[in-house]
């Protein structure tokens, strides 16, 4: 995985520099859509087929996305470069790194919230608001439910983890009692 990240980083950074000259959100949508298409085994199979030209593969990728940015010369050049260098499989990692650069520029971060119970809109908004104050940045939450937490939440923002779950507290108490 680290090797993929190392190879994908220059592509993501170059694409981000191009996106800074225009609409970063639209470019983000494009790269996310391309990543979804590149995850399809059928697309990877077609891309590696000797019967299909590289130009045809690039056209296939661009035809599969809805983003209006795909019609631009920069997007076409980017996709053609990936196809020519046999880097289509890197698109999911490029999308991840592009999103990280976008978040860094916006002063935002992705927050993975794991809750013992489903969170409704008001509860989630209140939780995110409090977390934004704690982490001092805008958060983009994704929520999962894990009943094994028993109660509370576990929040991961980048490499920081805030675990207020009952399971974590019980583990802490067990460690203190057995020490």
UniProtKB/Swiss-Prot annotation:
Localisation: Cell inner membrane
Signal peptide (from-to): none
Keyword Protease: no
GO CC term, one of those recorded: proton-transporting ATP synthase complex
Entry-linked InterPro entries: ATP_synth_OSCP/delta_N_sf, ATPase_OSCP/dsu
Keywords: ATP synthesis, Cell inner membrane, Cell membrane, CF(1), Hydrogen ion transport, Ion transport, Membrane, Transport
Entries under Pfam families matching the protein: OSCP (PF00213)
Bilayer disposition of the protein: Peripheral membrane protein
A GO term for molecular function: proton-transporting ATP synthase activity, rotational mechanism
Main location: membrane
Subunit-structure text: F-type ATPases have 2 components, F(1) - the catalytic core - and F(0) - the membrane proton channel. F(1) has five subunits: alpha(3), beta(3), gamma(1), delta(1), epsilon(1). F(0) has three main subunits: a(1), b(2) and c(10-14). The alpha and beta chains form an alternating ring which encloses part of the gamma chain. F(1) is attached to F(0) by a central stalk formed by the gamma and epsilon chains, while a peripheral stalk is formed by the delta and b chains.
HAMAP family assigned to the protein according to its UniProt record, in alphabetical order: ATP_synth_delta_bact
Function: F(1)F(0) ATP synthase produces ATP from ADP in the presence of a proton or sodium gradient. F-type ATPases consist of two structural domains, F(1) containing the extramembraneous catalytic core and F(0) containing the membrane proton channel, linked together by a central stalk and a peripheral stalk. During catalysis, ATP synthesis in the catalytic domain of F(1) is coupled via a rotary mechanism of the central stalk subunits to proton translocation.
Family: Belongs to the ATPase delta chain family.
PANTHER family according to UniProt: ATP SYNTHASE DELTA CHAIN
Protein name as it appears in the record: ATP synthase subunit delta
Organism: Burkholderia cenocepacia (strain HI2424)
Upper taxonomic lineage: Bacteria, Pseudomonadati, Pseudomonadota, Betaproteobacteria, Burkholderiales
Gene name per UniProt: atpH
């Amino acid at each position: 995985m680290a090797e993929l990240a190392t190879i994908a980083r220059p592509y993501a950074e170059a694409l981000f520099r191009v996106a800074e000259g225009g609409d970063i959100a639209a470019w983000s949508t494009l790269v996310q859509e391309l990543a979804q298409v590149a995850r399809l085994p059928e697309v990877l199979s077609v891309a590696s087929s000797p019967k299909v030209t590289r130009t045809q593969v690039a056209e296939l990728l661009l035809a599969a996305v809805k983003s209006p940015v795909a019609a631009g010369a920069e997007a076409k050049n980017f996709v053609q470069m990936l196809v020519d260098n046999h880097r289509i499989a890197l698109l999911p990692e490029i999308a991840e790194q592009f999103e990280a650069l976008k978040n860094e520029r916006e002063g935002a971060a992705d927050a993975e919230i794991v809750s013992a119970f489903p969170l409704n809109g008001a509860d989630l908004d209140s939780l995110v608001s409090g977390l934004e104050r704690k982490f001092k940045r805008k958060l983009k939450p994704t929520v999962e439910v894990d009943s094994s937490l028993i109660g509370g939440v576990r929040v991961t923002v980048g490499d920081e983890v805030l675990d207020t779950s009952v399971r974590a507290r019980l583990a802490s108490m067990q460690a203190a009692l057995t020490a």
